[in-house]
């Protein structure tokens, strides 16, 4: 099944719900970047979270960028997601693998805290005009979900529950995705609604398992998890959004990037290598710029 994002409301429009499946996008990222199990999980969570955030943007070309800058061995993570469902990302140390740790419930899980270490999550929202809106929060746990919830609370003053997860079965990635539940401004003063939503979210103890169970039926997932809040899928074309791992790089953009180096640096490349090779960080596509093209970029 294709990766999909589904939008819904609950509690008579007082709560916004969005769920996403990103399994295929993560498999594409895993293949392109040669990700380990640990970094696959982190990448999948970051892609899911960024798509959930981008889903609320009013313009189709709106973009959300998540960046983790920290002292952990993952050596940084960057993910771009657009309102149109496209997503891409890269990590500083894609082959990183750490021993599993035990959760509070006694389950073995990935050691996200030590992978990311101490640092910050940067969230950049860009609608394509004016200056992008940027906000930074300290990492809470490194597993992405808590970190995004912290960002939404402190930077956007929006109480939110964020769930992200993945399922690996027989050493194969079989499911990745996420869910966000937010109380909308018109219901923000309703304490009973906030308490009811919190109660619901506290019962979700194994999101990855529930996601795997409903991976082909996100509507069913929302109706199951929030059954007492009467969730309703949004009507119209905005109800569902296809998700794809898609990069915006191109040969022309690579040449434009070379121009920024300036005449002196390009001449140095010509003298030493006669050509340039540019690799896109996001998708690993390689662009070969031959000598004749390089010479056309400078005044010799």
Curated annotation (Swiss-Prot):
Changes after translation: Under oxidizing conditions two disulfide bonds are formed involving the reactive cysteines. Under reducing conditions zinc is bound to the reactive cysteines and the protein is inactive.
Keywords associated with the record: Chaperone, Cytoplasm, Disulfide bond, Redox-active center, Zinc
Main location: cytoplasm
Domain of life: Bacteria
A cellular-component GO term for this protein: cytoplasm
Compartments (UniProt record): Cytoplasm
Gene Ontology terms: biological process: protein refolding
SUPFAM superfamilies assigned: Hsp33 domain, HSP33 redox switch-like
A molecular function GO annotation: protein folding chaperone
Positions of disulphide bridges: 247-249, 280-283
Keyword S-adenosyl-L-methionine applies: no
InterPro entries in the record: Heat_shock_Hsp33, Heat_shock_Hsp33_C, Heat_shock_Hsp33_N
UniProt keyword annotation of Chaperone present: yes
Family: Belongs to the HSP33 family.
NCBIfam families linked: PRK00114.1 (NF001033)
Known function: Redox regulated molecular chaperone. Protects both thermally unfolding and oxidatively damaged proteins from irreversible aggregation. Plays an important role in the bacterial defense system toward oxidative stress.
Stated name of the protein: 33 kDa chaperonin
Taxonomic lineage: Bacteria, Bacillati, Cyanobacteriota, Cyanophyceae, Synechococcales
């Amino acid at each position: 099944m294709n990766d999909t994002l589904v939008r819904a409301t609950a509690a008579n429009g007082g709560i916004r719900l969005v769920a996403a499946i990103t399994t295929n996008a993560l498999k594409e990222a895993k293949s392109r970047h040669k990700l380990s199990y640990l970094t696959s999980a982190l990448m999948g969570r970051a892609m899911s979270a960024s798509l959930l955030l981008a889903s609320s943007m009013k313009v189709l070309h709106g973009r959300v960028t998540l960046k983790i800058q920290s002292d952990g061995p993952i050596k940084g993570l960057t993910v771009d997601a657009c309102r149109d469902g496209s997503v891409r990302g890269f990590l500083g140390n894609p082959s990183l693998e750490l021993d599993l740790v035990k959760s509070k419930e006694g389950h073995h899980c990935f050691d996200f805290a030590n992978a990311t270490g101490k640092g910050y999550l940067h969230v950049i929202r860009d609608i394509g005009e004016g200056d992008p809106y940027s906000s930074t929060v300290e990492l809470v746990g490194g597993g992405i979900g808590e970190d995004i919830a912290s960002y939404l609370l402190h930077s956007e003053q929006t109480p939110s529950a964020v769930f992200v997860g993945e399922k690996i079965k027989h050493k194969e990635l079989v499911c990745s995705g996420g869910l966000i539940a937010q109380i909308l401004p018109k219901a923000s003063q309703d304490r009973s609604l906030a308490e009811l939503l919190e109660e619901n979210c506290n019962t979700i103890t194994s999101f990855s398992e529930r996601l795997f169970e409903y991976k082909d039926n996100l509507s069913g997932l929302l109706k199951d998890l929030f059954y007492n809040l009467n969730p309703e899928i949004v009507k119209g074309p905005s109800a569902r959004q296809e998700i794809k791992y898609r990069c915006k790089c191109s040969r022309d953009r690579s040449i434009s990037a070379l121009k920024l180096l300036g005449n002196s640096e390009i001449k140095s490349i010509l003298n030493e290598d006669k050509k340039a090779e540019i690799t896109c960080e996001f998708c690993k596509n390689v662009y070969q710029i031959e000598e004749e093209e390089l010479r056309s970029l400078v005044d010799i």
